[in-house]
From Swiss-Prot:
Cofactors demanded by this protein: Mg(2+); FMN
Annotated binding of CTP, by residue: D287, K297, F330
Gene from which this protein is expressed: coaBC
Organism for this UniProt entry: Thermococcus kodakarensis (strain ATCC BAA-918 / JCM 12380 / KOD1)
Role description: Catalyzes two sequential steps in the biosynthesis of coenzyme A. In the first step cysteine is conjugated to 4'-phosphopantothenate to form 4-phosphopantothenoylcysteine. In the second step the latter compound is decarboxylated to form 4'-phosphopantotheine.
HAMAP family assigned: CoaBC
Source organism, top-level taxon: Archaea
GO molecular function: FMN binding; metal ion binding; phosphopantothenate--cysteine ligase activity; phosphopantothenoylcysteine decarboxylase activity
Descriptive protein name: Coenzyme A biosynthesis bifunctional protein CoaBC
Amino acid sequence: MLHHVKLIYATKSRKLVGKKIVLAIPGSIAAVECVKLARELIRHGAEVHAVMSENATKIIHPYAMEFATGNPVVTEITGFIEHVELAGEHENKADLVLVCPATANTISKIACGIDDTPVTTVVTTAFAHTPIMIAPAMHSTMYDHPIVKENIEKLKKLGVEFIEPRFEEGKAKVASIEEIVYRVIRKLHPKSLEGKRVLVTAGATREYIDPIRYITNASSGKMGVAIAEEAEFRGAEVTLIRTKSSVPSFVENQIEVETVEEMLEAIESELKGKKYDVVVLAAAVSDFRVKNKADVKIKSGQPLVLELEPTPKIIDRVKELQPGVFLVGFKAETGLSEEELISAARKQIERAGSDLVVANTLKAFGSEENEVVLVGRDFAKKLPRMTKRELAERLWDEIEKML
């Protein structure tokens, strides 16, 4: 591995360590994003090899991809049978072929089994035994062409996974680098939670004082989103109930809510409608709401007294609806010692029937890191300070042991 690649290798996560990815680049102007994409895949531990069509080399120079990946770039198929070396059926073959950004021309060629460029030849070689993902990029009128749509559907039926484009400015623009990386990790990650159904909440609720002002808290939703995405990486069928103020997520099935009442209704609807294996309540839910919300904006410039009332305790409803579900609660407190924090978590276990409580002292609200104590009925395990992504991994490791 070249030195400049070592400097970024697995610096964001180790999700793709040991995975060999062929980045197959057709001749789209969006190919200019491929340097960043390759580097981001490497930051998660991937070994990336670029294959370029002749038209792609007219948009970005092969040297750019050679720098980005730290590997020789395939721009033609020679006597070294590069397509077989990269994607043939052997022990050192690629784990994934990612066609990005895929033009209408390339998609249609792949659908028809035509392999007249290095890109299409590699895909044809890999098709029978290697996962293939395609990220389209073209003008929207081309994407809407009935034959192009037919070819996309044909490939989907054959097991090819498409990363849907963003529709902006009359174009079907290639998906964001963040979404592509997320989908690649989801595709290649070990599926230890396959067959499990998981419900996760994330973000801060809002309780309105008048039509524009509300009571909320400093939660960003990062912890809940990380937990939901980690579960999806591990193969679970995930439903993420996320507040409007939460950071965004790439989880496939999401429900957006705003108030405690809306969140409770969404949770009850899910638990009444289907059986869940795990429920993780990571949202920062308001404990109080205004008893009499104003219908119009309250005028400023004068003292204001608000009468508050408690909101429903969402966690208390979960086991009433599904007694057998594995319930993970969060307990955030200030000014408590570690022993007092553990005691508060155990009270939640007794009251709500939580199987595991993630207890912390609110120091990490809105930040990228967290320091928590995992509390069960008969154990308490303090974890060192770590990123919320790392904590999500540790949490699911613990849950899997307890299921």
